[in-house]
Amino acid sequence: MGQKVHPIGFRIGVTQTHRSQWFAKPKDYAKLVEEDLLIREFAESRLPDAGISRINISRQVDRIEIEFFTARPRALVGAKGETLTQLRDEIKAKLPDTRNVALYVTKTQQPEMEAICIAENIAEQLEKRTPFRRTMRQAIMRARKAGAEGIKIQISGRLNGAEIARHEWAREGRVPLHTIRADIDYATARAQTIYGILGIKVWVCKGEKSC
């Protein structure tokens, strides 16, 4: 059943941490979850070229701290920080309550091993009509060269414009989905092609962590 469980949610508290860290009263919980979702979706749609791999949100009484992990921090911050300041003001305007919003940016050291970066790069290549097998091979080669223990990529849809949709996958190294201590990163992406939407799934094994 390991393939039917979300690999990150399956490992929360062992090798993965919660992306949102805060406490709330039961009556406020749904509202704050909706706010978190709004912040994430807005930031990703506002800066699609920033290579954001993860967004962590923590809350205090009247303060929200948002940490962006990105492969291209300059695209997120701007030349003199004006892009980040503008993003903070726009997020603050979208929140229903007036609160202090603090943004932090952390550079992703190895984007070649980040599942979301790999998936989005594959989607970009497929939209440019690059052959899907070559795209998968190149992504696997880069991830393995960066130090990944294993990687699996699956692409689904009307591949090469075929009449019948199918899925194809490629794997190199070990990707143990049942091993909870395995540090598995997982992400999905979509490619809009002239034949329809292609779905991309990426699993990256970065090693094992002690429980």
Swiss-Prot record:
Keywords: Chloroplast, Plastid, Ribonucleoprotein, Ribosomal protein, RNA-binding, rRNA-binding. The keyword Cell wall biogenesis/degradation does not apply. Its main location: plastid. It holds the Pfam family Ribosomal_S3_C. The gene is rps3. This is Small ribosomal subunit protein uS3c. Residues 39-109 form the KH type-2 domain. It comes from the Eukaryota. Belongs to the universal ribosomal protein uS3 family.
